[in-house]
Amino acid sequence: MRQCGLVRAAQLLRTCGLAEWHTPYRALSSLPDEKKELIKNGPDLQDFLSGELVDKSSWAAYKGDLKRQKGERLRLPPWVKTEIPMGKNYNKLKNTLRNLNLHTVCEEARCPNIGECWGGGEYGTATATIMLMGDTCTRGCRFCSVKTARNPPPLDPDEPYNTSKAIAEWGLDYVVLTSVDRDDISDGGAEHIAQTVSMLKERNKTILIECLTPDFRGNMKAVETVAKSGLDVYAHNVETVPALQRHVRDPRANFDQSLNVLKHAKNVRPDLVSKTSIMLGLGETDEQIYSTMKALREAGVDCLTLGQYMQPTKRHLKVEEYITPEKFKYWEKAGNELGFLYTASGPLVRSSYKAGEFFLKNLIEKRKTKAI
């Protein structure tokens, strides 16, 4: 569960010539033309690197090691260092969360973009990813800093109402709902998530809702419950390449199970936008990355994000390699060539980072066009 400025108009999907990859997969015809257009006009890599980054002129001159040697710990390269902007939006959002006893993956997973997403600039869009079902997970993935326990506290029955109330107070047009894994509950919390989505839609029929879900231990009925709840984007992260699944994720998770979750959500609701994320820098090879991207496209996944793995604490997996911005740009092009409708690839990209802005920009433009 690796979640992860002003909106700048930029087109992501453009003609990309990768000599070795000739045949792009066709974009899914099941998506309505309106949603395809919204995704097509999303931001590019620079939108995900916007904010107060250090001087980029130092990037090329950086001579530090990018691959970890045995017994060593890598130093942070300049392109993953960023100032954390705080402001009125940040403080307002944080206070609202505390007052309503809500949690965000932004805080629990120690996301490096929390200041930018929550701050949103004085005129930007504040984005937060609400983490449902408490702050304690039943799984222990080696990359994640969220608290774990075999038997977390029971679900808060008021959480769906409080969440919808908070979103109404913020006046957001797009919200991301994620959750901890709750293997201690028969349906993994699917009904709780679905109820939250339903209440949000009751308060605001036009709000766009993305759910970043658990794998529900392969319970496809639970997947179906969430998929049919009224959400707009169904997201579930495969996290890493198949070869590293056992090393990186909890033993109860695996690549095929995650892929089946994404497939089933689309089978149930072909009009849904499906989305997943991969962390880089865990020791994967280029061949493994490309093979994974290809498998995701063949499974019908619409959107893909790729970001740098960052070790949250010394107890977690060490970073094996820091991927350069140029290499992330390479994978963005690869994703476009494979036919993903939306590929976000950059060092600080997270699956939920500023998630709504590419939708919001286009919705605003569309409304202006209708008004003329």
Swiss-Prot record:
Protein localization: Mitochondrion
GO molecular function: 4 iron, 4 sulfur cluster binding; lipoate synthase activity; metal ion binding
Keyword Iron carried by entry: yes
Keywords: 4Fe-4S, Iron, Iron-sulfur, Metal-binding, Mitochondrion, S-adenosyl-L-methionine, Transferase
GO cellular component: mitochondrion
Primary localization: mitochondrion
Location of the Radical SAM core domain: 122-341
Residue sites binding [4Fe-4S] cluster 1 per the record: 106, 111, 117, 352
Cofactor annotation: [4Fe-4S] cluster
Record-listed E.C. numbers: 2.8.1.8
Cofactor, how bound (note): Binds 2 [4Fe-4S] clusters per subunit. One cluster is coordinated with 3 cysteines and an exchangeable S-adenosyl-L-methionine.
Record GO biological process: lipoate biosynthetic process
Enzyme class, broadest EC rank: transferase
Gene3D superfamilies: Aldolase class I
Catalytic reaction equation(s): [[Fe-S] cluster scaffold protein carrying a second [4Fe-4S](2+) cluster] + N(6)-octanoyl-L-lysyl-[protein] + 2 oxidized [2Fe-2S]-[ferredoxin] + 2 S-adenosyl-L-methionine + 4 H(+) = [[Fe-S] cluster scaffold protein] + N(6)-[(R)-dihydrolipoyl]-L-lysyl-[protein] + 4 Fe(3+) + 2 hydrogen sulfide + 2 5'-deoxyadenosine + 2 L-methionine + 2 reduced [2Fe-2S]-[ferredoxin]
Pathway(s) per entry: Protein modification; protein lipoylation via endogenous pathway; protein N(6)-(lipoyl)lysine from octanoyl-[acyl-carrier-protein]: step 2/2
Superkingdom, natural source: Eukaryota
Binding site for [4Fe-4S] cluster 2: 137, 141, 144
Entry similarity comment: Belongs to the radical SAM superfamily. Lipoyl synthase family.
Other information: This protein may be expected to contain an N-terminal transit peptide but none has been predicted.
Annotated protein name in UniProt: Lipoyl synthase, mitochondrial
